[in-house]
């Protein structure tokens, strides 16, 4: 039976893609087949490719087309709903859900759905990316960017996930830059206050590698 996880972040730039790739590397090391989808990405090169989506493709074991991994690729590196408006496109949660289900029907048995920005990123005036996770009814893995303000951001996000009726399955402490002051104290507070197990504390890796990052994660209960 396949397992699907929605990877959310406490903010933009906290390392959702890096951790998504590390999760897949850890899962594939146990023999699982992995796949990922980033249904909406804002910020593409001249060929219409998004760097995060390309990283996901490199990390997964399944051979999926780019259009499956990143079906909505928006040129401008700004909030998705604004980028969509500039591109003359309309984003709808129901359509994004259908695109995600397409990947969920693949041969992979460990699937990652990566969000964009934080939990409440709008996709239109009425819906956010959280609505995609809610309609899919999948567990959420929260990436906490270990920097000043992370405790407040993490607790607010966990509360929002709970109020949306979803399970915060686990969280990952990720260092997107040099180690923050009082790192261990912040980490211990998060351990005590977040209502989910911590999968690991991933250090800042200047020469980032998914396999190396995976060594800092314990994903056994996600893959059982």
Regions found by a protein language model. Give the residues of each.
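Glycine-rich phosphate-binding P-loop
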Residues: 6-23
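Structural motif
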Residues: 6, 110-114, 141, 172
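C-terminal lobe/tail of nucleotide-utilizing enzymes
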Residues: 158-224
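Extreme N-terminal starter segment of soluble prokaryotic enzymes
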Residues: 1-6, 32-33
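Short internal beta-strands
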Residues: 38, 141-144, 169-174
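N-terminal phosphate/diphosphate-binding loop that engages ATP/GTP or pyrophosphate donors
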Residues: 18-90, 94, 99-103
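Inter-motif core of Ras-like GTPase G domains
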Residues: 124-147
